[in-house]
Amino acid sequence: MEANHQRNDLGLVALTMLAQYHNISLNPEEIKHKFDLDGKGLSLTSWLLAAKSLALKAKHIKKEISRLHLVNLPALVWQDNGKHFLLVKVDTDNNRYLTYNLEQDAPQILSQDEFEACYQGQLILVTSRASVVGQLAKFDFTWFIPAVIKYRKIFLETLIVSIFLQIFALITPLFFQVVMDKVLVHRGFSTLNIITVALAIVIIFEIVLSGLRTYVFSHSTSRIDVELGAKLFRHLLSLPISYFENRRVGDTVARVRELDQIRNFLTGQALTSVLDLLFSFIFFAVMWYYSPKLTLVILGSLPCYILWSIFISPILRRRLDEKFARSADNQAFLVESVTAINMIKAMAVAPQMTDTWDKQLASYVSSSFRVTVLATIGQQGVQLIQKTVMVINLWLGAHLVISGDLSIGQLIAFNMLSGQVIAPVIRLAQLWQDFQQVGISVTRLGDVLNSPTEQYQGKLSLPEIKGDISFKNIRFRYKPDAPTILNNVNLEIRQGEVIGIVGRSGSGKSTLTKLLQRFYIPENGQVLIDGHDLALADPNWLRRQIGVVLQDNVLLNRSIRENIALSDPGMPMERVIYAAKLAGAHDFISELREGYNTIVGEQGAGLSGGQRQRIAIARALVNNPKILIFDEATSALDYESEHIIMQNMQKICQGRTVILIAHRLSTVKNADRIIVMEKGEIVEQGKHHELLQNSNGLYSYLHQLQLN
């Protein structure tokens, strides 16, 4: 009745779903009590106030259909008749609109005509304050500005060194002019000796300062690189589990590897070339003093470089995008193949996998070749402009010398100065491909760094867990357009109770425990531990006090002791051994040559499946968690290993709340209570013998199947 009543107020339903989308928990009845004073549903004003009370930024706007693709989605389409719905995505290519029908509780795809018929031009845009902060801190090229400010002293020193280098670069052509126009004409050997010594000193200082500048600059950029690498890894581990479930491992790895491109760019010559280019204005002034005509030729060539770059850059960027996509596909396929090597060999499908790899590799090499060809065309275009300018300057300069407007020394000095101006431009043009690649890398890396993390700040860190668990009116789906996984689930688990959860595959058993670990927030309802809403709790505080053992557990490439004591490397050995004994792992560990110092190999490859599982159980027990979850934890064990664990189960469960998820009913038959789930709902609950008395029940049916 309560759900139907809430469904009648589509504004409240929309607010609940949008809050859940932004990882904010709410109690619909509390919102209704505070803001729906007349009982007729939330008005536009009360809806905006309710959103504000939840720390959501909501804005009512009027928008034409042709401009809907520009707004941040999902958004609420407000209807004066109360038939509100959510706009999730706009497909401009096919003129289709992905919406969510709040009344029917289902996603819908509307055509242009269908959408126009129900759209009244009113939208409510919703963002969370956390997402606004995330947008302000968006990772792009502006991310490096605070880093430059942080190391401004070092960059100032680099700037000062660059000034001296430019002064030396300015003096050298003047020496050559004096030699040509004065020394050679007047045969002044003493003057020549002085100039030669002075030039040698200038060259030595120039080499030393140039090396010093490169060292200081590389040192600074390396520190920025370390900061970026550390920030990236911390951010990656802080992302919600849904981020990883929706992306291929290889794609994520490929994006992280883009850090290498940024590193090479920062520590290369590109930024020092920019500094050199800034000082070109001084050289232009000196060159203008020598010959305005020749200077105009040099100035006239600069737009040619710029126009050529503008022409080539968009094409190059598109091809770099394609190259990255092919590289990411290869990375993902390689990771998938290595991970599934046992299956590939067992099914003898290596030829098919090799054929797929060859095709993907050929596609990558082809896209890489197109990038190389285009980059070569770009560089040769720059060389063509440079050579053309050199020929024009030679012809015009010779005419000026012949007419007496310019001396030979001045012409040589001018050409040397023009080289100092053009060289940074040439280097930047040749490094343009690197800059484009870095732009792609920043965008790809930004997909990781700009993804919202799990929110820890402002969450409650509560006292030690006792173990009371409550699921109230839980409704959950993994995506807005996905089917409902849990529907109106209500479950109370008392402190110290051992609960078994059984049911067919896909009935929602594991999803229930994911909500308990706060990997997700329910679309509707609350998950409480000791009366505290987990939506308001610090996830780290919660997960440190819950032990979890899955069917397929991952061990790190470390020693057995380090794997068991993963959460506390300084843990006393006695605690490690005690947990291993509880898990039935101590005996086989003691038989190993290195004992607890045995390296298990990547993902525990050096151990059998049963041994890996027992170490994982010991890892879950070592922190003495008040809540323990076994999610098909014993299904992969041999009967002897399972027997050892089941013998210790009473001691394992002592003083804890335990949730056992199993397909084998023998695993849960001694539980205090057994919960039977079907299609996201609890259909039966009771003790083993009580459930068997209902011959028409699902539990009795599953039990009979296993007996047969």
From Swiss-Prot:
GO terms, molecular function: ABC-type transporter activity; ATP binding; ATP hydrolysis activity; ATPase-coupled lipid transmembrane transporter activity
Limits of the ABC transmembrane type-1 domain: 155-437
Domain (Peptidase C39): residue spans on this chain: 1-126
SUPFAM superfamilies the UniProt entry points to: ABC transporter transmembrane region, P-loop containing nucleoside triphosphate hydrolases
Pfam family, one: Peptidase_C39
Main localization, broad class: membrane
Bilayer-spanning residue ranges: 159-179, 192-212, 270-290, 296-316, 389-409
Origin superkingdom: Bacteria
Domain annotation ABC transporter: ranges: 469-704
Membrane topology reported for the UniProt record: Multi-pass membrane protein
One of the protein's GO biological processes: proteolysis
Subcellular location as annotated: Cell inner membrane
Known catalytic reactions: ATP + H2O + proteinSide 1 = ADP + phosphate + proteinSide 2
EC number(s) stated in the UniProt entry for this protein: 7.4.2.5
GO cellular component: plasma membrane; type I protein secretion system complex
CDD domains: ABC_6TM_CyaB_HlyB_like (cd18588), ABCC_Hemolysin (cd03252), Peptidase_C39_likeA (cd02417)
Family classification: Belongs to the ABC transporter superfamily. Protein-1 exporter (TC 3.A.1.109) family.
PANTHER family for this protein: ATP-BINDING CASSETTE SUB-FAMILY B (PTHR24221), BLL6336 PROTEIN (PTHR24221:SF647)
Domain comment in the entry: In LktB the peptidase C39 domain, the ATP-binding domain (NBD) and the transmembrane domain (TMD) are fused.
Entry function: Part of the ABC transporter complex LktBD involved in leukotoxin export. Transmembrane domains (TMD) form a pore in the inner membrane and the ATP-binding domain (NBD) is responsible for energy generation.
Self-association state and partner proteins as the record states: Homodimer.
Protein name, UniProt field: Leukotoxin translocation ATP-binding protein LktB
Gene name of the encoded protein: lktB
